[in-house]
Amino acid sequence: MSVPSAPHQRAESKNRVPRPGQKNRKLPKLRLHWPGATYGGALLLLLISYGLELGSVHCYEKMYSQTEKQRYDGWYNNLAHPDWGSVDSHLVRKAPPSYSDGVYAMAGANRPSTRRLSRLFMRGKDGLGSKFNRTALLAFFGQLVANEIVMASESGCPIEMHRIEIEKCDEMYDRECRGDKYIPFHRAAYDRDTGQSPNAPREQINQMTAWIDGSFIYSTSEAWLNAMRSFHNGTLLTEKDGKLPVRNTMRVPLFNNPVPSVMKMLSPERLFLLGDPRTNQNPAILSFAILFLRWHNTLAQRIKRVHPDWSDEDIYQRARHTVIASLQNVIVYEYLPAFLGTSLPPYEGYKQDIHPGIGHIFQAAAFRFGHTMIPPGIYRRDGQCNFKETPMGYPAVRLCSTWWDSSGFFADTSVEEVLMGLASQISEREDPVLCSDVRDKLFGPMEFTRRDLGALNIMRGRDNGLPDYNTARESYGLKRHKTWTDINPPLFETQPELLDMLKEAYDNKLDDVDVYVGGMLESYGQPGEFFTAVIKEQFQRLRDADRFWFENERNGIFTPEEIAELRKITLWDIIVNSTDVKEEEIQKDVFMWRTGDPCPQPMQLNATELEPCTYLEGYDYFSGSELMFIYVCVFLGFVPILCAGAGYCVVKLQNSKRRRLKIRQEALRAPQHKGSVDKMLAREWLHANHKRLVTVKFGPEAAIYTVDRKGEKLRTFSLKHIDVVSVEESATNHIKKKPYILLRVPSDHDLVLELESYGARRKFVKKLEDFLLLHKKEMTLMEVNRDIMLARAETRERRQKRLEYFFREAYALTFGLRPGERRRRSDASSDGEVMTVMRTSLSKAEFAAALGMKPNDMFVRKMFNIVDKDQDGRISFQEFLETVVLFSRGKTDDKLRIIFDMCDNDRNGVIDKGELSEMMRSLVEIARTTSLGDDQVTELIDGMFQDVGLEHKNHLTYQDFKLMMKEYKGDFVAIGLDCKGAKQNFLDTSTNVARMTSFNIEPMQDKPRHWLLAKWDAYITFLEENRQNIFYLFLFYVVTIVLFVERFIHYSFMAEHTDLRHIMGVGIAITRGSAASLSFCYSLLLLTMSRNLITKLKEFPIQQYIPLDSHIQFHKIAACTALFFSVLHTVGHIVNFYHVSTQSHENLRCLTREVHFASDYKPDITFWLFQTVTGTTGVMLFIIMCIIFVFAHPTIRKKAYNFFWNMHTLYIGLYLLSLIHGLARLTGPPRFWMFFLGPGIVYTLDKIVSLRTKYMALDVIDTDLLPSDVIKIKFYRPPNLKYLSGQWVRLSCTAFRPHEMHSFTLTSAPHENFLSCHIKAQGPWTWKLRNYFDPCNYNPEDQPKIRIEGPFGGGNQDWYKFEVAVMVGGGIGVTPYASILNDLVFGTSTNRYSGVACKKVYFLWICPSHKHFEWFIDVLRDVEKKDVTNVLEIHIFITQFFHKFDLRTTMLYICENHFQRLSKTSIFTGLKAVNHFGRPDMSSFLKFVQKKHSYVSKIGVFSCGPRPLTKSVMSACDEVNKTRKLPYFIHHFENFG
């Protein structure tokens, strides 16, 4: 009867090669005679070779064709329970688990150290032979048996390392008596689904099959086996002579533990390729592995000779079945009786309900009894009883010298010599004592190369949660011991001290004794009652539960006759038939040595007579990585520094380009001078501690210039009005000191230069003399002592200090000292300082500088002439003091007299119209505008005469002038002379509070509020104004922190048992948490830059709930947050990689399942950083991140925008590398894609929308070069392009750098059928654009095109939604309003259904002067014409003056007021707009608007310009809103420049 196959096996059966037909074949009459063959062995091989063709050939064919192939991994042995006995199945428990916590913590928490127990009960003398003359071959064959059925001591993942305490001054491990040593112990692999609760305590797994199925020979993996097979004649691979297996050149994952005596990982290719990964551990177990490989090949060769037509697979399978059967027979019926001294009950057949699993007590305690028989060395001999010595002359090979180095052992030794030596060698005594080679010198990891097997055995029982010794006995049906002597009465009778030590060690707790200790102590001569019961029970279950057991006739593998013959096979038959050992050279019962057996051992081996074992303590896995780790840290630290240096160089490069451009532009504008310019390098001496390198330029005009290294002028030394130049040179008595030269001219501070040498000074003097002669000037040269010259030199700094003191004294004498202010001179030096001040006088240039004007301005000349009463060309201290007193305390008539005298050029006592016209022109010149023509000046003067009834006169007397200025009498009260020289104003500060404004604001009598309520109002107002920003910022950081905390908690507490957590500590929690947060932040950045989406959302009501205008600020906040977490992630991983680099190969095996390391390869820091996907991309990401963030610095963005933008395009690489970064799964599955997917799709779609116009080449309709280097470009508007006024585009020109795009605001209105931009030439690109379209250079045939990307939403585009709006533009920030104001007047004046809600709009233009914005004045002029509904009110603030009530400003105001009355337009701009001088008081203005438009609930305030401007407007809105009155001001802003 055939046994039904399992589903997997049926699939295999279909592919089985059918047995070749044998119907007509007759048996050859052969007699097989092999050396040493016995009746059983000969008959066995006869049966195998001929296929049992003793009867019917057909019978055999039928049987073999239906024979089921046994799987290698142990599955489907039991068809009802396919996983029983399979690889990675649980160890089984017969006794209840006894974990300390009931779940997984090691048992015996209160028991003594296992090393101490080992020293107490397992230490003894070597060299005591077996009581029953068991051979060493039996002792090592026991290891084969163990390897065949169990592998449950190997550490699993995660690594769990425990420390076995070592007593101080331990003779082996703590010879220095340090007391801090420990033996590392790794817990065994277990099922990850167990150990979670008391209902499912931890269960260790068996990584071998539990069956005796030849897995020691054939492995548990078919892939592994295929590497061993030759696929020729059914044999396994061997070397050419067929005696040894091949080396592991294919790098099958054999165990390649470090050799203790070498302290390094050797190549796995030196090992023999065999079925069990542990076979290279020692020479004895390796010999058995080679023996059975030969046994398989011997059978295969015999089968092939008899059946030459059989396939390789048929031969292999038949040989495998026979090898497994012979192994089963040897283990159960030969080894076990010899080991236990008793046999198993007779076989009763297959019992499918019996579980074959390896028991915990069997694996962790009972079957480890065989360790006591292991000798300290291995004898080798030949067939003539010649025992072979080692090369050093020792009688045997020391076991502890061959751990994991057995492959080289067979270079001068044969398997036969080892097997015959083991058969003659008597094992160690069967007692609790272990020989020193396994008790003190067992192999270990490189950091602890020698371990204690006895201690490890006890720890393994605790690891498996074994109960105490008595409970374990009871679970196997044995009686509990009630007294200590019950354990082993004969032993304790002969060794009573052992009993005392046992009681003391376990605190006299008999029910707390470890299973292994109790079992070993009860054994003597052979396993004790308990261990015998455990071992017999285990092997009986293995035999009876095995469906493929060779005695099971129902499996169809062997016939009863074959089974009977197989039962006769012994290990002696296998050795004699597989090796060159002859039958008389080895005893028949190889497990026992009896008198008369061949070749008795010379003596019982003792460790003292063998080669000493080396003991190398400690190993640093980080060795070799120290320098590289330092280099990596330094490199990563220098990356941002290098990026910053590159950014600095880029800024300097762009500044240099701008300077060269500026110089070229100035050269084109300036008149051409004839003559050459001579130069010389020198150092300008400023004071004792400061010098600067300068280039002195002579000419070409009559002036000497000092220029810095950037080419910028530092000082001009004018010689126009000077005839004689005084030159002093330092005396030549200081040879070692560098020479100095001093240039002194009247009305200017001195120029002191340090030259490199006296020769250089002579050269300088010669050049200066020639230059002065060329311009017809004289030079006086005198030699002065160097120190005296430097002490007397009046440098700029000294002159400045003197002038400050000059102005301060004038202020103090006029107004007195302020409260708390002290005079800054001492009494001792007061007289000298007073004299110094009295002697100081101001030149016209210094006076002009104090007024903030140029010396050639007419106003300066006139004012200087008024103050300089003695007309000596300088203003003395007394003259200046009188003027200050007059302006600060003088009467209005006195001030008017000064103005009258300024206008009276010819000093005839009257002002004619010509003189008044000249003054008007000087005032207009101050305002830096050219909008006032001759006719307008004449018209203005006639109007002023007419206003006071003097139209019949052509001149004004002083009385007439007073009459004309009568209405401005109040303004003249506060007239002062504002000077920059002093650090205080020369006006009473109370007068400065007033503002000249057209806004009539009545003072509001607010009730005084308690300061606490005022603070509360301010706080509430702040929250109300920024509620959306605060909410989304709060939401953003809550999500970011939650993501960090979630991952941190997961890796800190939920995954604390994993290897990542064990190795990296809290570092992995920090890095994984920061990875989650930075993934979120970087992904969110894409949404903030989805400009088309943001622009579109502004058209929907949702924009009321999302602060879309703040997307740039939020982009920066999210980026800075991402930067923080990126740096944290990087630093964390640097620490993590350090920890990883300090780990052993075994620990790294569990670190990740994604990376496999060769057993002889130790990855260092360079591997993790530069040879893994995660490390390499991480370094690249760090570099890209540094580049992007450094080049995003505001300074670089402003000075080198092109570099900023080009570096910012690296974000594509940032996101690609971030996606790749986690694919290696070193620390976990990649998660970046989860955050990136949504924003990435949105951003990609947004970019696709931008492509709609980006690659559309638009025709240039018209270009216009405007003053102040502005160009207006009008170009084609694409069809279906919709935009709002105030929006902006990114623009490029196909004529040059077509891929370089720059952002510009659209100045065309949405209703116009074209697009336009006003671009001021500032940088290289804008200058190229202007020069390209310059009519002098432009070729109309070139027909360049414009490409745009956008339009995108600006902060000002929602202006039309407010009934009342205030618009504030400053500097270049007026550009959006060119479009907005046009759109406003179009919407309110021509189309009542335009959707513009504005009923009143205030536009405030703040600029230093109108000079650079003539084009915008034209725009405003056009807007004023179109504004028929007067919805727009324009105010212009000119900020170039210091003070509202400065003398100049007052006169300008008077003229402006007259001109406004006369022509209804401004004298400066020609606009109806009101002009103001100075900066606006935004708070007062907003209060005025609030009061005037109290009927609305909210007013929109829109500001655009430099950051200080928008911040001041924001502050004003905050201040007004704090009053908690309606209307409420909502501020929208956009920063330019």
From Swiss-Prot:
Q: Boundaries of each EF-hand domain copy?
A: 855-890, 891-926, 936-971
Any Pfam family the entry gives: EF-hand_7
* Annotated spans, Peroxidase-like: 63-628
Signal peptide (residue range): none
Annotated positions of the Phosphotyrosine modification: Y1105
Q: In which residues is Ca(2+) 2 bound?
A: D904, D906, N908, E915
Membrane topology classification: Multi-pass membrane protein
Region (Disordered), start-end ranges: 1-29
User: Could you tell me which residues carry Phosphoserine?
Assistant: S826
Q: Which UniProt keywords apply?
A: Calcium, FAD, Flavoprotein, Glycoprotein, Hydrogen peroxide, Membrane, Metal-binding, NADP, Oxidoreductase, Peroxidase, Phosphoprotein, Repeat, Transmembrane, Transmembrane helix
Observed phenotype of the null mutant: RNAi-mediated knockdown severely reduces adult survival following the ingestion of E.carotovora.
Q: Name one GO cellular component term.
A: endomembrane system
| Major localisation | membrane
The family this protein is said to belong to: In the N-terminal section; belongs to the peroxidase family.
Function as written in the Swiss-Prot or TrEMBL entry: Plays a role in innate immunity limiting microbial proliferation in the gut. Acts downstream of a hh-signaling pathway to induce the production of reactive oxygen species (ROS) in response to intestinal bacterial infection. May generate antimicrobial oxidative burst through its peroxidase-like domain.
Name recorded for this polypeptide? Dual oxidase
Please report the organism this UniProt entry assigns to the protein.
Answer: Drosophila melanogaster
Gene encoding the protein? Duox
